[in-house]
Amino acid sequence: MDQSKMRRTNQFRKTSQKPPSTGIDSYPTPAQSPMAQHETPMWDFNSLNPYFSMLNMNDGINYARHQQNHIVTSRPPTPLTDLMSLRSFQSFPNVFMPVSRSRTSSFIQSDTDSSRLESDDFSQNVRCFSADIDRSKSYGSSKHYHLKYSRPALSRNSRSFTRSNNVLPTWSLDSNGEMRSRLSLSEVLDSGDLMKFAVDKTGCQFLEKAVKGSLTSYQKFQLFEQVIGRKDDFLKLSTNIFGNYLVQSVIGISLATNDDGYTKRQEKLKNFISSQMTDMCLDKFACRVIQSSLQNMDLSLACKLVQALPRDARLIAICVDQNANHVIQKVVAVIPLKNWEFIVDFVATPEHLRQICSDKYGCRVVQTIIEKLTADSMNVDLTSAAQNLRERALQRLMTSVTNRCQELATNEYANYIIQHIVSNDDLAVYRECIIEKCLMRNLLSLSQEKFASHVVEKAFLHAPLELLAEMMDEIFDGYIPHPDTGKDALDIMMFHQFGNYVVQCMLTICCDAVSGRRQTKEGGYDHAISFQDWLKKLHSRVTKERHRLSRFSSGKKMIETLANLRSTHPIYELQSSGHDSFKTDYFSTASEHDGPELEKNGIEEGSLMLEPRSNKSSVSVKFSSSGSHGDD
């Protein structure tokens, strides 16, 4: 707390009478002698705060000798429990007398939040206490004080959210300041005060309920004129927290009323929104009005409204905005592709793609576009020309994505786009392109990335068997072991905080294939033997490193996966060979007699790179800092 503020708010206040609205009542007995009046002043220690420790204790005696009976308080109410233990107070037993209180000391770190608030967090003349106290205390025979601390009805710290009707016109309120129960919509429309009702919570709720009822033609005309008839009023209501709901309702009524003014109203609505398209898209409340208009307007006018979207950097701002991105998603959902094809071309631009995909809201826009272009491939209502347009747009966007798939796969948000492409069977062509162009020969490094490891998992789960075999071979035999430690790619990934999830995925795939839960045939060729060979290699490595693995939750999951397979689906050659390594007790936690066999190395948090067996690249050992995974 600011020292200057502390000095201002914590000065002792001397009052001979009860201050107004303090919640402290004083009931004096008949007057005593002048000397008796100076003997028993009362000090309220519930109000003292740390500044009290800097005061001169002699001030208390001076107040007691020269002032009449008084109550000394300070704000904010910060209770103090340890003051009476100070040696200084032992000399003044009759001067300093604590008032009972029901809170603990504010010096304790675990005290309530209200004890740590500043003076600005409280009302001017309100005392806040945690419980009501109504006690009488007698100090000697000269004076009786009756103190009553009551919880205030309203303070800045415990603010009541009861609505104030200051916005509504006085003629609409009753004697209690509330809206009249028999108020009608016609009165509001005839008065010309509809704007005041629309920006008030209760007033807007009244209008919302009223317009849903049966309306006369004249009432509709008045609504249209006062809500969507004037541009300034329309924009003011559209950007208001309450008024935007009324605008949406009136737009729905307007578009459902097919009278002589139907076309004129829609054209006017389109012009109003088009003139402020960017600002309304970026507004938290006006963006809902745009979405409602796109949903309900005639398609021809809605398409013209889409053309009002900017084609420059402002479109990036709309795509990555928390509110405006929903406008783009609504355009993609309800407007034909030929009217928003420019959005696809804009997003597919390399620099724009990087900015939009790397944003938490922009990545959702791109994924929505991909989903729409993919889903329309099954739409039989589309003409051949529309299908050709869809395929070309999808190809342009996918080409831009695959050219930067490695950069996108390692991004916090863009990796979801790559995951979606890899896991979607309708995008199998682009999935294979991503695996071959981006993931192959980089599996070890990407598996050690926090976000790219999810992409690698999806690739193992959804890759065609031919590519899956290449990926498995790369992990098992695609890298030269480290010259100093002898670690190969599987060993590094098995004990890495992110790579271990990829190994678990590989193990699950092999177990499912061997147990018959996964298809092993593709293109007339059965890969069952390959799955058995991969499982043997994984089983051998888990057996070898069982003690280290049993120390981590990820390792225990690998051990448990093999143990479950042993109990439900016996492995042919492993079981027939009499090897008992699938028994659960064989994977028990390492004991103290294991000695050097138990290494001290834990889960790796850095990225260890190995040299591929192919001569395409040679990478030295490199560690990069990453955040630890909560599972380990």
UniProtKB/Swiss-Prot annotation:
The keyword Cytoplasm applies. It comes from Caenorhabditis elegans. Residues 12-35 have a biased composition (Polar residues). GO terms for cellular component: cytoplasm; nucleus; P granule. The keyword RNA-binding applies. Its main location: cytoplasm. Residues 1-37, 609-632 are annotated as: Disordered. SMART domains: Pumilio. It is found in: Cytoplasm; Cytoplasmic granule. The lineage of its organism: Eukaryota, Metazoa, Ecdysozoa, Nematoda, Chromadorea. RNA-binding protein that binds to the consensus sequence 5'-UGUGCCAUA-3' in mRNA 3'-UTRs. Involved in the control of stem cells and sex determination in the C.elegans hermaphrodite germline. May also play a role in the hermaphrodite germline proliferation and oogenesis. By binding to the 3'-UTR, represses phosphatase lip-1 expression in the distal part of the germline mitotic zone. Binds specifically to the regulatory region of fem-3 3'-UTR and mediates the sperm/oocyte switch. Negatively regulates gld-3 expression possibly by directly binding to two sites within the gld-3 isoform b 3'-UTR. InterPro entries: ARM-like, ARM-type_fold, PUM-HD, Pumilio_RNA-bd, Pumilio_RNA-bd_rpt. Expressed specifically in the germline (at protein level). The gene is fbf-2. Changing H482A: Does not affect binding to lst-1. Residues 1-11 have a biased composition (Basic residues). Fbf-1 and fbf-2 are >90% identical on both nucleotide and protein sequence level. Experimental approaches often do not distinguish between the two genes, which are collectively referred to as fbf and are considered to be functionally redundant. Changing Q367 to A/S: Increases binding specificity for 8 nt RNA target. GO terms for biological process: cell differentiation; negative regulation of translation; post-transcriptional regulation of gene expression; sex differentiation. Pfam families: PUF (PF00806). Residues 615-632 have a biased composition (Low complexity). This is Fem-3 mRNA-binding factor 2. PROSITE patterns: PUM (PS50302), PUM_HD (PS50303). Interacts (via C-terminus) with gld-3 isoform A in an RNA-independent manner. Interacts with dlc-1, and is required for the localization of fbf-2 to P granules. Interacts (via RNA-binding domain) with lst-1, probably displaces bound auto-inhibitory C-terminal tail and alters its RNA-binding affinity. Changing L444A: Does not affect binding to lst-1. Changing I480A: Does not affect binding to lst-1. Keywords: Cytoplasm, Developmental protein, Differentiation, Repeat, RNA-binding, Sexual differentiation.
